[in-house]
From Swiss-Prot:
Pfam families: TPR_8, UNC45-central
Residues recorded as bearing N6-acetyllysine in the entry: 55, 468
Underlying gene: UNC45A
Gene3D superfamilies given in the database record: Leucine-rich Repeat Variant, Tetratricopeptide repeat domain
Entry's Gene Ontology cellular component terms: nucleus; perinuclear region of cytoplasm
Keyword annotations of the record: Acetylation, Chaperone, Cytoplasm, Developmental protein, Differentiation, Myogenesis, Nucleus, Repeat, TPR repeat
Subcellular location: Cytoplasm; Cytoplasm, Perinuclear region; Nucleus
Described purpose of this protein according to its UniProt entry: May act as co-chaperone for HSP90 (Potential). Prevents the stimulation of HSP90AB1 ATPase activity by AHSA1. Positive factor in promoting PGR function in the cell. May be necessary for proper folding of myosin (Potential). Necessary for normal cell proliferation. Necessary for normal myotube formation and myosin accumulation during muscle cell development. May play a role in erythropoiesis in stroma cells in the spleen.
Residue stretches of each TPR repeat: 6-39, 43-76, 77-110
Annotated organism of origin: Pongo abelii (Sumatran orangutan)
Protein name per UniProt: Protein unc-45 homolog A
GO-annotated biological processes: cell differentiation; chaperone-mediated protein folding; muscle organ development
GO molecular function, one term: Hsp90 protein binding
Quaternary structure annotation from Swiss-Prot or TrEMBL: Interacts with PGR isoforms A and B as well as with NR3C1 in the absence of ligand, and with HSP90AB1. Binding to HSP90AB1 involves 2 UNC45A monomers per HSP90AB1 dimer.
C-alpha cells in the first residue's frame, strides 16, 4: 500500500508540474519522500524536486536536491543535468562543466547535453579572457598608486576611481584581494586626503559586497577597530562612505548566504556571529569615545539600528539584541543624555538624541518576554539614578535629558523613569531656573511626559500655569516656543473628538497662530522652529486649526522648506501635521444604533468636527497640492536617516493615498514624482503603511499611463505591491483596484506579464473570478484576459482536468455586458493562440452554441466582434466543429452579418462562410456571395 501511495503521489506531482503548478508538485514529491520510499524512488523524487526548484529559480535548493539524487544513483543523467543547470545559474561554471561531461559520457548521442556543454565551455573561455584583462587593469592601477615618482594627484585619483569600478565586478574584486590590494587601500586611507579615502572605501565596498569570505579577509587585514574608527572622522562624506562599507559588511556576514553569492566562496566561515559581535562591540565603544565627530556618532547609531534588531518578529532568535542591551545600553543612554548646547565631552548633533531614541525603541520592541523587558527597565533606571543622585545639578540635567530620550523612544521605560523618586519634582523645579539650558531640558521633558492621557491630565492640573508663565514671561524664544508646544500638546489631548477640549474655545487657534508665526520666522534656527511644527502636529487635530493652516501659504512654504533642512528630527512632526490636515488616519463611521445605546448608557461618544466632513477635506487636499506638498514629501521619502522610521513611512503613505483619492489630482502627484516615491514606501515599512502605499500605486496605475508614471525599470517594481493587495486580508476596494492596475500592466508587455506570473498572482486572480461582487469578478476576468497572451497562462487553460475554459464560456453568456466583453475577449485570444481549445468549447457546456449566437446577435459591436472571432477560430480549427456550427442557426446569423459594411465583424463572418465553402459544407449562392 505504501509503494502504491508513493507512486500515486509521484504521478500527482508530475501532473501538477505539467500544469505549471510547481509549488503543488513540490509538495506532492515532499509528501512522497515522507513515506517509506525505496532508494530508487527517493532518487527520482529528489530529481523531480530539483526540477521544481529550477522552475521556481531557487538554485541553491535545486543543486542540493540533485546532489541527493546522485548520491542514490550516480548514473542518473537527469539529476546530473539538473545539477549542472543549477550550478551554472549560481556561477559555479567549473563544477557545472564536470557534471555535463559525465552526462555526455553516459549518453554520447544526446544533442541537448552536447549543446549545453558547448555553451558552458564558451562561457568559461569568456570568463578567462575577462579575468586576464581585469588582472592587467588592476595591476596598472596599482602601479600608478604605488609609483613614488607620480606626483600628480589627479592621475592617482583617476586610478583609484577605476579601482572602484573594477572592484564591483567579481573578477576585479578577487584580483584586488589577491594582489595585496587591501594593504594598498589601507595606505590610501592613512593619507587623510578625502578623495583618496573615499575611493579606497568605495573599492572596499565592491570587494566585500555579498561575499562573506572576502569581508572576513578584509576585516582581518585592516582590523575591525581601524574600519570602525573611520566613522568618527570630521569629514562628513568620508564618515558616510565608511558607514556604507560597514553596512555592506554587516549584510555579507548576516544575510549574505541567503542572497546567493557571485562566484564561489573562497573561505569557510566557522562562526560569522563572532565577527558580527566584534563589529557591533566596536560600534558601541565608538559611541562614548571622546574625539569622535557628532556625524560619526549618528552614523554608528544608524548602523546599530539596521544591524541589531530582528528583521521579523517571526524569527525566534533575539540573542543579539539581548547581548547589545547587556553590553551597550548604558553607552546608548550616554549619547541620548548628552547636550548639544553647551557642548559636553561627547560631540553630538541635533539628530543624535532622536537616533538614540529610535535605537532604544527598536531594542525594546525586539524583546520577547516580561523578564527581558524588566531587565531593560532596571538598567535604564540604574543609569538614571546614578546621574540623579549625588552628581549635583549637572547630574540632574543629564538624568532628565536621558528620561526625555526614553520618552521619545520606548515610552514605557520613560514613564517608569519619571516615577522614580524626585524626577518629576526635579523637572518642575528646573522649569523655574534662571539658566536657559536648564529650562530647555526641563520643558522638553515636560512636553514628552504629556504624551500619555493620564499624565497629560496631571500636568494640565499642575503644570499648565507654569508653562503659561514661561510662555508669557521668558525673554528667550527657544524657551517660549517649547512652552507653547507643551500647551499645544495638552490642548490636543482629546484628539479629533470635538466634544473633548482641554482648553477654552479659541485658545487652540491662538496657540496655532503663534506656532505659524514662529515657523515663518527665518531668523530663528531650524532646531527651534522644529518645535513650532511639533506644536502644529498636535493642534491640527482641531479642524478649525487645519482650515487656517492650509490657508496660510507662507506657513506651508516654511513647513516644506523645513522638511528639506538638515533638521531630520522634524520629519515625523511634518508628516503628522499633514496626516491631520488630510484626515488620512483611519476613521470608521460609528453604527447609529451603538451610538444611541452608548448615549442611553451615559457613555461618552466621540463627535466629529463639522469641518472634518469630506467636502472640507477635499478642499484642504487641493490647497496642499497647490502649495507643493508632493515635492516636499518626495524629498522626505529619499531621506537616508533613522528618523524615517516605519511609523513615519506609514504616515507618508497615508498622505499620498489621500492626495490621489480624486482622479483629477493624480496627474499633479505623478508630475511631481509621487509615483516614484511610492515604490519604496510600498516595499518597506509597517504592514498598514505598505498597504496604503500599494493602494495609492494602484490608483495611479489605473488612471495614468504606467510607462510614463513609472519609467524604465521602475514599472517592474510596481508589480509586487499590487499583488500584495490581492490577499484576503485586504478590503474589497483594494482587491478591485489592484486587479484593475494589474490589468493595465498585463496589457503592456510580455516581460510585465512574466513578472506578474512570477509573483504568483494567477491563482489569486482566478479566485476572484468566482467572487460574488460583480465589479471584482469583472476586473479579475479582464486581468485574466490580458494575461492569456502569455504561454504559461495558455498552458493552464489547455491542461486537462480544470474548469478555466468553462468559466470563460459561461461568463460570455452573462447579463453583465462588461463581464461578457472581458470573457469573450479572453476566449477570442485563447482560441487564436491555442486552436486545440476550440474542440473543447462544445464539451464544457451544452449551452455553448446559444452563448456564441447571443454574442453575434448583440447590439454591442465589440461583443459581436469577439463572438465572430471565436466562431472563426473554431471553424478554422476543425471541419467537424464547422459542420456543427453550419447545421445550426449560426449559418443564418453569419450570412446576415457578412452582408454588412466593411467592419471587422463583417470580415470575420465572411471568413467563416468562406471556410465553410472550402470544407464543402455549404455552397456559394448564384451571385458568388
Amino acid at each position: 500500500m505504501t509503494a502504491s501511495s508513493v507512486e500515486q503521489l509521484r504521478k500527482e506531482g508530475n501532473e501538477l508540474f505539467k500544469c505549471g503548478d510547481y509549488g503543488g508538485a513540490l509538495a506532492a514529491y515532499t509528501q512522497a519522500l515522507g513515506l517509506d520510499a525505496t532508494p530508487q524512488d527517493q532518487a527520482v523524487l529528489h530529481r523531480n524536486r530539483a526540477a521544481c526548484y529550477l522552475k521556481l529559480e531557487d538554485y541553491d535548493k535545486a543543486e542540493t536536491e540533485a546532489s541527493k539524487a546522485i548520491e542514490k544513483d550516480g548514473g542518473d543523467v537527469k539529476a546530473l543535468y539538473r545539477r549542472s543547470q543549477a550550478l551554472e545559474k549560481l556561477g559555479r561554471l567549473d563544477q557545472a562543466v564536470l557534471d555535463l561531461q559525465r552526462c555526455v559520457s553516459l549518453e554520447p548521442k544526446n544533442k541537448v547535453f552536447q549543446e549545453a556543454l558547448r555553451n558552458i565551455g564558451g562561457q568559461i573561455q569568456e570568463k578567462v579572457r575577462y579575468m586576464s584583462s581585469t588582472d592587467a587593469k588592476v595591476e596598472q592601477m596599482f602601479q600608478i598608486l604605488l609609483d613614488p615618482e607620480e606626483k600628480g594627484t589627479e592621475k592617482k585619483q583617476k586610478a583609484s576611481q577605476n579601482l572602484v569600478v573594477l572592484a564591483r565586478e567579481d573578477a576585479g574584486a578577487e584580483k584586488t584581494l589577491r594582489s595585496n590590494g587591501v594593504q594598498l587601500l589601507q595606505r590610501l586611507l592613512d593619507t587623510g586626503e578625502t578623495d583618496l579615502m573615499l575611493a579606497a572605501l568605495r573599492t572596499l565596498v565592491g570587494i566585500c559586497s555579498e561575499h562573506q569570505s572576502r569581508t572576513v579577509a578584509t576585516l582581518s587585514i585592516l582590523g575591525t577597530r581601524r574600519v570602525v574608527s573611520i566613522l568618527g572622522v570630521e569629514s562628513q562624506s568620508v564618515s558616510l562612505a565608511a558607514c556604507h562599507l560597514l553596512q555592506v559588511m554587516f549584510d555579507a556576514l548576516k544575510e549574505g548566504v541567503k542572497k546567493g553569492f557571485r562566484g564561489k566562496e573562497g573561505a569557510i566561515i566557522v562562526d560569522p556571529a563572532r565577527e558580527l559581535k566584534v563589529l557591533i562591540s566596536n560600534l558601541l565603544d565608538l559611541l562614548t569615545e571622546v574625539g569622535v565627530s557628532g556625524q560619526g556618532r549618528d552614523n554608528a547609531l544608524t548602523l546599530l539600528i539596521k544591524a541589531v534588531p530582528r528583521k521579523s518578529l517571526k524569527d525566534p532568535n533575539n540573542s543579539l539584541t539581548l547581548w547589545v542591551i547587556d553590553q551597550g545600553l548604558k553607552k546608548i543612554l550616554e549619547v541620548g543624555g548628552s547636550l548639544q548646547d553647551p557642548p559636553g565631552e561627547l560631540a553630538v548633533t541635533a539628530n543624535s538624541r532622536m537616533s538614540a531614541s529610535i535605537l532604544l525603541s527598536k531594542l525594546f520592541d525586539d524583546l520577547k518576554c516580561d523578564a527581558e523587558r524588566e531587565n531593560f527597565h532596571r538598567l535604564c533606571e540604574n543609569y538614571i539614578k546614578s546621574w540623579f543622585e549625588g552628581r549635583g545639578l549637572a547630574g540632574k540635567l543629564r538624568a532628565i535629558q536621558t528620561v526625555s530620550c526614553l520618552l521619545q523612544g520606548p515610552c514605557d521605560a520613560g514613564n517608569r523613569a519619571l516615577e522614580l523618586s524626585g524626577v518629576m519634582e526635579g523637572v518642575i523645579a528646573l522649569c523655574a531656573s534662571e539658566q536657559e539650558e536648564e529650562q530647555l531640558v526641563a520643558v522638553e521633558a515636560l512636553i514628552h511626559a504629556a504624551g500619555k492621557a493620564k499624565r497629560a491630565s496631571f500636568i494640565t492640573a499642575n503644570g499648565v500655569s507654569l508653562l503659561k508663565d514661561l510662555y508669557k514671561r521668558s525673554e528667550k524664544d527657544s524657551i517660549r516656543i517649547r512652552a507653547l508646544v507643551g500647551l499645544c500638546k495638552l490642548g490636543s489631548a482629546g484628539g479629533t473628538d470635538f466634544s473633548m477640549k482641554q482648553f477654552a474655545e479659541g485658545s487652540t487657534l491662538k496657540l496655532a497662530k503663534q506656532c505659524r508665526k514662529w515657523l515663518c520666522n527665518d531668523q530663528i534656527d531650524a532646531g527651534t522652529r522644529r518645535w513650532a511644527v511639533e506644536g502644529l502636529a498636535y493642534l491640527t487635530f482641531d479642524a478649525d486649526v487645519k482650515e487656517e493652516f492650509v490657508e496660510d501659504a507662507a506657513a506651508l512654504k516654511a513647513l516644506f522648506q523645513l522638511s528639506r533642512s538638515e533638521e531630520r528630527s522634524v520629519l515625523f512632526a511634518v508628516a503628522s501635521a499633514l496626516v491631520n490636515c488630510t484626515n488620512s488616519y483611519d476613521y470608521e463611521e460609528p453604527d447609529p444604533k451603538m451610538v444611541e445605546l452608548a448615549k442611553y448608557a451615559k457613555q461618552h461618544v466621540p463627535e466629529q468636527h463639522p469641518k472634518d466632513k469630506p467636502s472640507f477635506v477635499r478642499a484642504r487636499v487641493k490647497k496642499l497640492l497647490a502649495a507643493g506638498v508632493v515635492s516636499a514629501m518626495v524629498y522626505m521619502v529619499k531621506t537616508e536617516s533613522p528618523v524615517l522610521t516605519s511609523s513615519c513611512r506609514e504616515l507618508l503613505s497615508r498622505i499620498f493615498l489621500a492626495l490621489v483619492e480624486e482622479v483629477e489630482d493624480r496627474g499633479t502627484v505623478v508630475a511631481q514624482g509621487g509615483g516614484r516615491a511610492l515604490i519604496p514606501l510600498a516595499l518597506e515599512g509597517t504592514d498598514v503603511g505598505q498597504t496604503k502605499a500599494a493602494q495609492a500605486l494602484a490608483k495611479l496605475t489605473i488612471t495614468s499611463n504606467p510607462e510614463m508614471t513609472f519609467p524604465g525599470e521602475r514599472i517592474y517594481e510596481v508589480v509586487r505591491p499590487l499583488v500584495s493587495l490581492l490577499h484576503l486580508n485586504c478590503s474589497g476596494l483594494q482587491n478591485f483596484e489592484a486587479l484593475m492596475a494589474l490589468t493595465n500592466l498585463a496589457g503592456i508587455s510580455e516581460r510585465l506579464r512574466q513578472k506578474i506570473l512570477k509573483e504568483k498572482a494567477v491563482p489569486m486572480i482566478e479566485g476572484y473570478m468566482f467572487e460574488e461582487h460583480e465589479m471584482i469578478r469583472r476586473a479579475s476576468t479582464e486581468c485574466m484576459c490580458n494575461l492569456a497572451m502569455s504561454k504559461e497562462v495558455q498552458d493552464l487553460f489547455e491542461a486537462e482536468g480544470n474548469d478555466r475554459l468553462k468559466l470563460l464560456v459561461l461568463y460570455s453568456g452573462e447579463d453583465d455586458e462588461l463581464l461578457q466583453r472581458a470573457a469573450a475577449g479572453g476566449l477570442a485570444m485563447l482560441t487564436s493562440m491555442r486552436p486545440t481549445l476550440c474542440s473543447r468549447i462544445p464539451q464544457v457546456t451544452t449551452h455553448w452554441l446559444e452563448i456564441l449566437q447571443a454574442l453575434l446577435l448583440s447590439s454591442n459591436q465589440e461583443l459581436q466582434h469577439r463572438g465572430a472571432v471565436v466562431v472563426l477560430n473554431m471553424v478554422e480549427a476543425s471541419r467537424e466543429i464547422a459542420s456543427t456550427l453550419m447545421e445550426s442557426e449560426m449559418m443564418e446569423i453569419l450570412s446576415v452579418l457578412a452582408k454588412g459594411d466593411h467592419s471587422p465583424v463583417t470580415r470575420a463572418a465572411a471568413a467563416c462562410l468562406d471556410k465553410a465553402v472550402e470544407y464543402g459544407l455549404i455552397q456559394p449562392n448564384q451571385d458568388g456571395e
